[in-house]
From Swiss-Prot:
Regions recorded as binding DNA: 298-348
Single GO cellular component term: nucleus
Protein name: Two-component response regulator-like APRR2
Subunit structure as annotated in this protein's UniProt entry: Binds the target DNA as a monomer.
Amino acid sequence: MVITANDLSKWENFPKGLKVLLLLNGCDSDGDGSSAAETRSELESMDYIVTTFTDETEALSAVVKNPESFHIAIVEVNMSAESESFKFLEAAKDVLPTIMISTDHCITTTMKCIALGAVEFLQKPLSPEKLKNIWQHVVHKAFNDGGSNVSISLKPVKESVVSMLHLETDMTIEEKDPAPSTPQLKQDSRLLDGDCQENINFSMENVNSSTEKDNMEDHQDIGESKSVDTTNRKLDDDKVVVKEERGDSEKEEEGETGDLISEKTDSVDIHKKEDETKPINKSSGIKNVSGNKTSRKKVDWTPELHKKFVQAVEQLGVDQAIPSRILELMKVGTLTRHNVASHLQKFRQHRKNILPKDDHNHRWIQSRENHRPNQRNYNVFQQQHRPVMAYPVWGLPGVYPPGAIPPLWPPPLQSIGQPPPWHWKPPYPTVSGNAWGCPVGPPVTGSYITPSNTTAGGFQYPNGAETGFKIMPASQPDEEMLDQVVKEAISKPWLPLPLGLKPPSAESVLAELTRQGISAVPSSSCLINGSHRLR
């Protein structure tokens, strides 16, 4: 069936209805033809019109007789029958885009199929994604074969796609690439045509039409750059002497607004250098730029004017100062924003070259001052939390002879005199302390001598002087606490004795019982028998 343009216009759900020639072997690798049936069913599920062939000669004759009946061909190739499949590929590649499929994954076979003209090589089993996108090869072949070589079946496809893409392309161009408001070519033409309207007179001998053209091109590249007089003298840092220039020359100045303002120059004063052939001499001809077509006055920065400028900069801050704000604070009517901006740039550069070390020293001093409060707080904390030394200081200079190594550990403290007596009262006046494991020594006579402020090195400190360490108070047990401990041990003899108390010996117990009038003491055998009876 021949597809006409009218039929194609009704093809709304493209690529549905795509005609596919499916050439399969008579028997696949499984031997039951299930793979061929699956491939056909998958293509038909995508609304493709599938025509199946099992003989290469029959399929080739159908393509030759009715080329408009097919849009694409899918051919299966096997290692055993490569020659027949390749014959169909060589004959049909100029008419239909041909896709080769195979169950054997062989690089040599794949390369041979692509070399003979196959558009793609797919390995079975075929995925639905691959079969869904085979229409892309149809469109690709329709657009890349040329108008005269496109087959009859692909011409309607190409015309339909061209009509759709043409509309979309126009819309894309209008949206993405709008016509510029000021085309660059138009600007160039205006600059070149300006030579007919502008008459620039130079006071140089070797200035021709080519020099004027180069001058205009250099001026266009500069853009918003400001005019600077080229002189043989050096500019003073504090005083800038400029001349007043007059002119009506029109100059195109590109800014953010994109506006172009033209002026016409009657005469331009050009200062020559030693080498008059340098480009800077010709570029100095176009200098005067003014937005309101008035002559620009270049002021002389006198000391009084510079003083006002410095005061305004210091009030705003060197880093935050801008020309417009400086101009408002100075309140000088003869100055312009351009004059202030130029002078501000020179002022910052001059300050940067002269004051780098002073700024560095200021920052170093400031950081040091910020660090001092932390150091003061640490000293106050160290004074309030003075450590308590449990040992006297040793190893001071002058204690040991020269060359001698002081010992690592301090010498032991030497006690002077006897310790103070410890008066302890027994819990009962009739019971000896030895009977219950509390030995009581004889009373000690004598006085306890308090050691003076003497260190191990022999240094004497006066009374009341601070020696750097504190004497810990001697801790003595309280009599009430001792009485309570002894009473608890007597009332509960089955409990372990507290620390410091020893169990009484058998001799001391018998002696105490005899002293109290208890003479009959049961033997150990009686105690054992009594215990059995209690059980």
